[in-house]
Amino acid sequence: MNEHNPAHRPLSGTTVLEFASILAIPSCGVHLADMGADVIKVEPLTGDPHRYGVGPVLPDESKGFTTMNRGKKGIALDLAALESRQIIKRLVEQADIILMSLKLSDLTKFGLEYEDVKKWNERIIFLEHAPYGRGGPYGQEGGYDVVVQGMSGLASVMARDINGTPGVLTPAVADMATGLASALAVITALRHRDLTGEGQKVSTSLLQTSLILAGNRIHWFAATDPEVWNSAAEALSEAQHDGKSFEQQRDIYTAITNPGGGPATNTYFRYYRATDQFFSVGALSHNLRTKFCSVLGVTDPRTNEFNMSNPDDYDRLVSFTRQCEDIIRGKVAQHWIELFRKNGVPSGPFNFPHQVFDEQQISDNNFILELEHKMLGKYKTYGPAIQMEKTPVFPNSSSPSLGEHTREVLVSLGYVDEEIDHLIKKNIIRQYE
């Protein structure tokens, strides 16, 4: 972790204020901290709710919070207090970037809209995260991954069927992708400021990110889709009225919008079950599919005259897929991985979380890092999203305790110990002891 000089990281000297909780924007803060930014996480006196979420390991810290808040300083204050507003004003005056994911109604309540804070610092870059976008009936509400998965259509194409109902996609893919998009947004705005001297507001949303994640499946073309979509909508409505399961509904929908698609005929881009384990195959091009068939000694029925809309041809394709499954089930996964890769077919292991730490491809590239937590000791977690040759990217510390750096930060703003002690006594700020 300390093999490089922290001062040489690309965002060294950049100050970021993070008013955010749970996943999406805190993960953005992690990316910026890994790149060297001085990220100050501003929490309420009770702390980010993620502190008390899944995997509690300390009274005020969960495993999830630890992994989503490494490399940050932490202060805790009562946003509603007048004295806190003065603290925030001083923070903003010295900051470069604000990451804001408070509900839009709270921004107005606490005077933290972009128009408010830019009066204190016109060069500030203000990331406003409105989970569903600012407009519309959901615009003022807090956002959750499960809601946007459903609203965006992402779950309809990716979710599993659990007892007839769609299962939520986990981990929270929209949250994590939004964190990356948010980091891209503020760094792009930082570049604009370098060129022009101007700050600005930038925006991200979970809903927009979800639409992007589903982008190769959710689209509409006037030349081909209106009639198909009308037929699919009618069939889906009937299936829902009849109480069919989610999987049945999706199969009906897919049969109309993507004839011949679906798991029954997916031969080349999927996970297979070998004698011992699962493994992956990714053969999308004609050349790769030919190699796949050569390895297994099979012939794809589509190499001859074939019509997917013909029931007999469709059944032949289903039988072909089952044939491949039966052959593969006869040997162990490693045999097939080595054989496919030797013949140029993309293939790899299917790992559960505990196996990731022993995966050579991951360890050889330092994609997993070992960090030190002041109370928990050593732990392993994901590495930075990017690497740079001239300006190394790496985390420099673990997550902060609730209010761990409150006194340190306030002293840097010009507060003296007597003032800080008074604010602590009035329960306006919190300092970890």
Model-derived features: positions:
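Short, well-structured beta-strand/strand-turn elements
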Residues: 39, 341-355, 416-421
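Charged, glycine/proline-rich intrinsically disordered loops and linkers
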Residues: 222-262
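Aromatic-enriched alpha-helical interface/lid elements that frame and gate functional surfaces
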Residues: 252-256, 260-343, 347
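Conserved anion/nucleotide-ligand pocket segment
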Residues: 167-231
